[in-house]
Amino acid sequence: MVKNKVCLICLFLALYFLFSCKTGNSERNLPAIHLKGTILQPDSILLGHKVVAIVDSHLVVPTWKNEYLYDVYKMKGDSLLLNNRLISRGQGPYELTVSEEMYDVLSGRFVIYDCNMGKGFLLEGDSVGKMMDYTLWKSLGKFHNEVYISKMVIETDSTVVTAFMQDGFKAFLGRYNLNTGKHSILYGLWPDDGFEGSDYVKQTVYANGSLLKCPDKNLFLVSSQMGQYVEIFRIEQNQIVPVSKLFDLYPQYEVANDGLNVRYSRDNMRGLDICVTSEFIYVMPDRGTMEEYVRDIQNSDSYNYTDEIFVYDWNGVLRKRFKLDYDILTLLVDKDNHFLYGKSIDKETSDEYIVRFELDGRF
């Protein structure tokens, strides 16, 4: 009898541990490695909120300026020197009005696209010279009609994998052929979050999160915009095959009163910021719930910023937990896992700056 009770207790603990691992709770208990950051001082006002690419010791930073979409800074020691500007705002053949981007950290290529215009470019980013030469840009053409593409990542020289919204399909991932302009749907991943309403509303929740690819393997990653859901998958022919969930805290939401949009519960965790290299997945959970955010944001300019990063391999195994000495908003890691870059803020002056953290010897 005692032996049976012991077995039941062991089984309960094992199940609890497994559940905690899936939901991301157990990661909090992993000993933290503390990282010391260095502020990179810009030679001009920094009007961007993240680093999206690292090219030839240059950082590409989206800007809020009216004329251009990106500023390009050269790193010199602990300084940032404004070196160039990339992509004018407008309706011209080499212009966009707003932009999203996907950077392939291994090859240096990245896609810059405007979801509203249905237009984008593939840039060769292995050198600043190539990146700035618009004659080398490959146009993506008009990449949506009935389908609205919100995210895309490079799969091959001729295809990108997309996150999309198009009513009537229980899927939110697809493949767009750059040569033919054809968009096809990839089935096999439809998160079991309990929502039974419109397919389009559910697509909106997951198509506006993160979509990333392992630079040298047939492995991809998606996350939700709210909640804390992260899943690794691969593609076999035209089918998605789930591989591993890093977090499965699904978002809580419903159809808004207009019948089209999403209304999120204020109990939702506020999502995650993620970047990847060939070896690792860096996950930075946002701080608090939506309710806490709405309540506290008025009293703290730095509420959006956090100091904790979890590092997984592409098998879904947690490898490290980093604790930063600066709170950051977004993150990007170079292809060799040598440095991590994040946007931070001075809590007293509200000045914004980029911080660099050294990762050498941490793995």
How would you label these PLM feature ranges?
Residues 31-39, 81-90, 129-141, 183-192, ...:
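Beta-propeller fold detector
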